């Protein structure tokens, strides 16, 4: 099933989340003083900006999988009847004889119309197909004496080959696909799982072709048409940052793909703002463990922020170090649905200096358990495809392995009364639903998303929920409004258009997504001295796909909430209208 629309809402606008939010919060603290209750967003670069910067990979459900026809009658049968002497089913191993006999009952010893015998054949075939045995065939043989034989050929894969050598990475492809040779008959769910897993090997593209063996009915050879991209990359920039740390910001990512037989990926990420006020770098290494799909990612990074403006005047600097690991496993991986589970352990070391003196320090150790379920459906009818994604993450602060103790004073915590052994639950659900086609290949779709965070604890600044960015509550930089608890909702109406053609022997794919949106978000603080906020915005824009590797975006937003701080603080309201741009190039 094709994903609704040519584009999806980008997650990578919302970068530099912490880098910007921190500047804002510290500015309030410096300028307003302790007498006024403030909503103090985190200081710059309190945690890695990368989760808020990089485009989140969209579930590629069913990509590259072979399609199988629905079984039907093989031709028009003559209007005749025969005297059936006996009925046998030959070659069936997947089901007990008693189960098969139910489908052929009433044929033997009777004069039966050919259409009824054909119906029994289709019932046998339907039994196999209904259980996912899509490579199985059932044929019919009737001899002159009236003996009826249903010949079942249970399709199976006996060998897997690669179309070309791709170095050590080919070993990982074969480890996955060779699982298919152990099943007889072959189940569609298994075929889809192992093919989709092979496609998740970094830098590897896989397309399956099945070849029949003329000497062995039912025996198939799977030829994996493979290609490999050793190096891939991403460069993206926009103007959504906080003014004293941007607002122009950029991210460069370089990947070295599958250089060993473990399907590894080495990734280097560099985040940089307009005049170098915020800089962050991270290196990660990921690889498969075994041949079932379990994957481990290890990472480490560091950054520094020294914003301009009021914070620059007091010589504000923040330093961050992050490290950790992620174990992920695809529990369910099929053509139209996928369920991924992951276990995370994150370490964050954050220090803030003002005028060269250490002002606060936090050391966090956090265990997280996360799940993502994605599915495609046709609930609205044929031609109205939809894709939905549900995300849940449970996080628990770990008061060990070097974590800061609660209630410390030297140096103090970055947020008063914050609990290092906190608990929180974060989640979101989104759906992009195709509505209709107004003309040609164009489609109109509705994208809706809702989500938020719940906790009963006063969270460290690094773990508060950030509103703003490019995916929801647009018009505010990511982290401009934060809270221990939060909720948001967004609705976006999209007009998707596109055209593909060849120019100078190059395939060109042009596309445009015009959209209008309305966003709402609200935060609640468990710290009584912090403010709660509600923000709303509306606007529209266009996402232009100039080639398959280059996208340019423009957006106009009307802020419906402009006064984020009490007027008594003297904080000026935000401007009502703001214009954003973005560009992304992939290699």
Regions found by a protein language model. Give the residues of each.
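Periplasmic polypeptide-binding modules associated with outer-membrane biogenesis and secretion
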Residues: 2, 38-241, 253, 271-272, ...
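Repeated loop/turn-to-beta-strand initiation elements of outer-membrane beta-barrel proteins
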Residues: 206, 231-233, 260-266, 291-297, ...
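Residues that define the transmembrane beta-barrel architecture of outer-membrane proteins
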Residues: 218, 246-250, 277-281, 319-323, ...
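Transmembrane beta-barrel domains of outer membrane proteins
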Residues: 225-227, 238, 255-257, 284-288, ...
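Transmembrane beta-strand segments that form the barrel wall of outer-membrane beta-barrel proteins
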Residues: 231-241, 252, 263-274, 281-283, ...
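Transmembrane beta-strands of outer-membrane beta-barrel proteins
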Residues: 233-235, 264-268, 294-298, 339-343, ...
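Outer-membrane beta-barrel "beta-signal"
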Residues: 254, 544, 556, 573-587
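C-terminal outer-membrane beta-barrel translocator/porin domains of Gram-negative envelope proteins
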Residues: 351-520, 524, 567-569
